[in-house]
C-alpha cells in the first residue's frame, strides 16, 4: 500500500514538472528552448524527460513547442501585416523558410495563403 502511495506521489511530482515546462513553453516560445533546459526545469534527467512529457501531454516537447508557435503565427497572420520573416522571428524561428515549411506541415497551407484566406473571411 505504501509503495502504491509513493508511486502515485512520484507520478504527481513529475507531472507537475511537465506542466511547469508546458507553461514555460507557452511563455517562451519565441526563443530557442533546449531540451536540457526543459528537463532541468521539470526536475528530470534529459533522457527521461522526453518520454515523461509525451506520457503526460500526448506529444513530444518539440511538437508541443511547434504547435504553440504555429498557433501564435496564425494570430499574427490574421491580425497584423507583419512580413513572414518578421512573424517567423517573433515566434522563435531563425529562418522564414523553416517557419513556412513547419506552418505548411502543421496546417496543410503556406502562411501567405492562410493570411489571404483569413482576410477574406472578414
Predicted regions span which residues?
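Basic/polar phosphate-binding segments, predominantly the helix-turn-helix DNA-binding elements
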Residues: 20, 24-26, 32-68, 82, ...
